[in-house]
Amino acid sequence: MRIGHGFDVHKFGGEGPIIIGGVRIPYEQGLLAHSDGDVALHAATDALLGAAALGDIGKLFPDTDPAFKGVDSRKLLREAYSRIREKGYRIGNLDITIIAQAPKMLPHIPQMRVNLAEDLQCHIDDINVKATTTEKLGFVGRKEGIACEAVALLVKE
């Protein structure tokens, strides 16, 4: 078994909607990023890559490469997981915490879990997504951006 941790943060800017966990969520602002700005999938991808000792999302998909401009983060997650499978690992479980004052994530979490389970070729019970606020503290509390943490467990096939 191998454990990895991932973290991502993106600042609000421009027009919405935002994409979190592969779900388009209506919001008055978007998230500034080279890709689609999906903090949940970026943190999850980093956690998985870390568990497999494959570096991080920036190493595999650098923001200096125009090929990744505006890219769907589900595509990046699937590519990273393909490399992990080549090393002989599969998902044990994935736990994601979205940290956002707004918008509310709860109505969108079921579809996020479906998307992740589909992309990681695993049972939905292997995927947990939850959301919290910072009680109006810090940049998240001031609604300046969204952060996300993820922990992944990989098991050898």
Swiss-Prot record:
A divalent metal cation binds at D8, H10, H42. GO terms for molecular function: 2-C-methyl-D-erythritol 2,4-cyclodiphosphate synthase activity; metal ion binding. Homotrimer. Belongs to the IspF family. It comes from the Bacteria. The keyword tRNA-binding does not apply. One of its GO terms (biological process) is isopentenyl diphosphate biosynthetic process, methylerythritol 4-phosphate pathway. The record marks H34, T133 as: Transition state stabilizer. Involved in the biosynthesis of isopentenyl diphosphate (IPP) and dimethylallyl diphosphate (DMAPP), two major building blocks of isoprenoid compounds. Catalyzes the conversion of 4-diphosphocytidyl-2-C-methyl-D-erythritol 2-phosphate (CDP-ME2P) to 2-C-methyl-D-erythritol 2,4-cyclodiphosphate (ME-CPP) with a corresponding release of cytidine 5-monophosphate (CMP). Binds 1 divalent metal cation per subunit. This is 2-C-methyl-D-erythritol 2,4-cyclodiphosphate synthase. The keyword Lyase applies. Its EC number is 4.6.1.12. 4-CDP-2-C-methyl-D-erythritol 2-phosphate binds at residues 8-10, 34-35, 56-58, 61-65, 100-106, 132-135, 139, 142. Pathway: Isoprenoid biosynthesis; isopentenyl diphosphate biosynthesis via DXP pathway; isopentenyl diphosphate from 1-deoxy-D-xylulose 5-phosphate: step 4/6. Its cofactor is a divalent metal cation. It catalyses: 4-CDP-2-C-methyl-D-erythritol 2-phosphate = 2-C-methyl-D-erythritol 2,4-cyclic diphosphate + CMP. Keywords: Isoprene biosynthesis, Lyase, Metal-binding.
